[in-house]
């Protein structure tokens, strides 16, 4: 299932985005299907998903040495996609690489433009009892596949919200600038904590501080009622309780919010309602079967748009960006030109 799960792919690029790393690299399309069953279309589909997840540098791991005298198909790498001259698709491989080069010329420029920091509540995983001697945290492990974080990540993605994951340690390095939550690499509109039962004292204290300085911090399916850890000082336990008791929530539709200094803490069982409360807009193109990733550049914004549906799309597509002009570039052919566009209630509609 390599390259087929967007949520799993986004874990590593999230770190690159929040930490200000220019490249997020992936060993890509190593094992898509059985030997000689994968084609370049399968590879492109996998690469597009990596690009949507924030990967902007790739390498292949299927080109191994094979002596000239070795009988066909030559020496093979044990994984199933073979990028070497004995594969019938070798002559066309260059066209895929031209496509990749063109896409990455944009995705390696500028900075990420995501709105939501999705907190990975590792303390809940650590608190689970079980007979497994070693925990794994790869994208396809049950710690991700069965987590409340994944539930929120899928909901955010399906509804067109742009997000990155963030850990406790990374969250402690954030600060507030103009009501935006700023990491070393990017700025975000909100932090989403998803159905966490336990949370480190320092993390909760930081979330409260961010709200106090003007941020909107949102909690999906409740706020943690207990601190993480085995040895907790009475002073910290008392302060943790004081922080929670000080929250005076008032219902506003499907959301309950409490003012904290210049900002607010909000709770709801509806992620869309929480995003609306945090003034986070969605990319409505997802409703048409398109997916995208945005980046900020010196001259505006880049969109990498992928048609994930099984139909051809020729229609007006809304962008969650107000623009004076728009250009289209087809990375497969290299053809570019100005796009037909119109403004619609603060957003830009582009004809694709």
Where are these regions (language model features)?
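Carbohydrate-binding surfaces of carbohydrate-active enzymes
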Residues: 1-352
């Amino acid at each position: 299932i390599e390259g087929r799960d967007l949520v799993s792919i986004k874990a590593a690029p999230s770190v690159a985005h929040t930490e200000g790393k220019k490249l997020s690299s992936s060993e890509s399309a190593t094992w898509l299907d059985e030997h000689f069953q994968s084609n370049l279309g399968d590879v492109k589909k996998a690469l597009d998903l990596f690009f949507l997840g924030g990967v902007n540098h790739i390498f292949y791991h299927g080109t191994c040495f094979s002596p000239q005298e070795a009988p066909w198909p030559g020496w093979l790498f044990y994984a199933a996609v073979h990028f070497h001259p004995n594969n019938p698709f070798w002559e066309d491989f260059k066209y895929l690489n031209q496509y990749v080069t063109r896409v990455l010329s944009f995705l390696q420029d500028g900075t990420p433009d995501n709105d939501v920091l999705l907190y990975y509540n590792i303390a809940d995983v650590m608190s689970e009892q079980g007979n497994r001697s070693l925990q794994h945290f790869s994208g396809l492990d049950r710690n991700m596949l069965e987590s409340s974080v994944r539930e929120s990540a899928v909901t955010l993605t399906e509804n067109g919200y742009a997000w990155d994951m963030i850990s406790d340690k990374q969250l402690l390095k954030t600060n507030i600038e103009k009501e935006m939550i700023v990491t070393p690499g990017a700025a975000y509109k909100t932090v989403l904590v998803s159905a966490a039962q336990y949370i480190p004292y320092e993390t909760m204290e930081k979330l409260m501080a961010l709200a106090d300085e003007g941020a909107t911090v949102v909690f999906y399916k409740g706020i943690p009622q207990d601190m993480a850890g085995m040895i907790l000082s009475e002073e910290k336990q008392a302060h943790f309780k004081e922080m929670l008791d000080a929250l005076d929530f008032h219902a506003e539709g499907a959301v309950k919010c409490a003012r904290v200094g210049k900002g607010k803490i909000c709770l709801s069982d509806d992620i869309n309602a929480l995003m609306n409360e945090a003034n986070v807009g969605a990319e409505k193109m997802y409703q048409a079967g398109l997916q995208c990733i945005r980046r900020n550049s010196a001259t505006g914004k880049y969109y990498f748009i992928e048609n994930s549906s099984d139909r051809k799309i020729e229609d007006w597509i809304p962008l969650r960006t107000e623009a004076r002009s728009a250009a289209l570039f087809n990375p497969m052919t290299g053809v570019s030109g100005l796009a037909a566009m119109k403004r619609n209630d603060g957003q830009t509609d582009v004809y694709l």
